[in-house]
Amino acid sequence: RGPQKLGFDFTMAFQPIIDLPQRRVFAREALVRGTDGSGAGSVLSQVTTANRYAFDQRCSVKAIEEAARLGVEDAVSINFMPNAIYEPSACIRTTLLAAARHNWPVERIIFEFTEAEQIDPTHLQRIFEEYRRIGFKVAIDDFGAGFSGLRWLADLKPDIVKLDLELIRHVDADPRRRAIV
């Protein structure tokens, strides 16, 4: 696939991801925002089946560009849409070029997906394997909120699992939630 016109612009905000035992920021999650300061919803509402691939590609490039411009020293975690990726080794080329252009080591890139849509587990496993082969880390975001189950943890072997907020809410006072976590 060649470059596609997206039809709208957006920027990134970087939210720290904390390693609690170490009590330090170890990465920054790149979150889409409107150029007018609006939230992710205003941007994501413009993503369609027709522009999903272009949006996914632009998110990766924009996250690296903005992190480099801002002097981010931690790893950058980039959300991706597995259903926008038709062939992992081909679809990652634009990201690799952006990383090289900005001297951003692939070891400082984490790709994470949210289980917001039905995903073919075999396809996702191929993506994870290719990304790991390149040197990226892979993560599941909002685990426990979507379509996947514990089997995905065993099969996908993510480097990082970010639990859904509703799963950990009141974990200190709820023995069942604590046991799950």
Regions found by a protein language model. Give the residues of each.
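Active-site core of bacterial EAL-family cyclic-dinucleotide phosphodiesterase domains
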Residues: 1-46
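The catalytic core of metal-dependent phosphodiesterases that act on cyclic dinucleotides
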Residues: 99-170
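Catalytic core of bacterial c-di-GMP phosphodiesterases, primarily the EAL and HD-GYP domains
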Residues: 54-123
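Alpha-helix-loop-beta-strand connector modules within alpha/beta enzyme cores
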Residues: 180-181
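Intrinsically disordered, low-complexity terminal regulatory regions
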Residues: 1-14, 50, 70-75, 90, ...
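Short acidic-capped amphipathic helix/loop micro-motif used as an active-site/signal-coupling element
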Residues: 35-38, 60, 64, 142
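A cross-family glycoside hydrolase active-site/sugar-binding cleft signature
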Residues: 13-15, 31, 77-81, 112-114, ...
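Conserved protein-kinase N-lobe ATP-binding Lys motif
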Residues: 36, 47-50, 80-85
